[in-house]
Each structure stands twice: as structure tokens, then as C-alpha cells.
Amino acid sequence: MKIRSVSHNNRKKAFEVRTSTRTFLLPYAKVSPEPMRDNGIARVFVDPELGREGFTYVLESGKEGTVHIEQVLEYNQDPGFLRDALLYKLTIEAQKRVEASPLAKREIIRRLGTSATQFYRLLDQKNSRKSVDQLLSLLHVLDCDVALVVRAKSA
């Protein structure tokens, strides 16, 4: 996700990060070095060195800080980002389990009832078009119990 613009709002004590879909807020308290009243932000800009996927801010003292868009999305609990993070974690676990499994890959593919191409897409962590359901099926074939725990958010 690319950042279109970034600004700082001292009244809200937060950065305002605008993407193509919406605007996100990131409080100063979530970045390091943290801007303070006596050491405010001199300038903030979308960083082209990060492929416009992050921004850099410079404090009046000369210290710099860089923030990636993933930090902003994680703080704002963006549903798309959280889904992709869950898929990534499940994919990495599936890759480890496939390597450690005594089953041949052809047998795993047969038990999944899918093609070899689809199987390798499931194991590709860059592929975000797969579903959690498909990964859970793969983990089940690999004799894994997956427990989904839902709990109240801690303060």
C-alpha cells in the first residue's frame, strides 16, 4: 500500500497518513524518537527510498524517525492487514509442517483433492489470494490441530 501524503497534527498529537483508500492516524507516542513539546517536528515527508510505503520525520533537534505503512495499519487494526498477517503466519507454519511431514507432497496434494499448482500457491507466502479455509484444510491434512482463540483485548 502506497502513502499519498503525510502531515502532522500537533493538536491531535498524531501523524495523518493518507493512502488511496483512507486516512489513518498514528499517535506520536507510537513512534521513536517521540516528538515532544520542546522538540517538535521540523518536517515530515513520504519517503521515496521506501517506495512510498513509509514516511520520515525530522525533529527540531535533528533526530530522524522512519515509519513503515505496516506500523500504521497494525496500530489502526486495518482488517485487510490483519487478514494478510494471519494468512502469512499460517503459511509459514504450513511450510514448516510440510517439510517436517513424513507424507510425500503428492500424497498431501491427493488428500487435499487439489492440483499441484494450487498446493504450491498455498505454500507461497506472497500469494494473498488464498483463503484461511484452504490453509486450515492443508494443516488438517498434515495432522495439525489449529485452535482459534478469541479473547478480550487488553488495555
What are these regions (language model features)?
Residues 1-112, 116, 129, 133, ...:
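Motif-centric detector for short Cys/His coordination patterns
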Residues 123, 134:
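DNA major-groove recognition helix of helix-turn-helix
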Residues 126:
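Catalytic-site neighborhood detector that most strongly recognizes the C-terminal catalytic loop/helix
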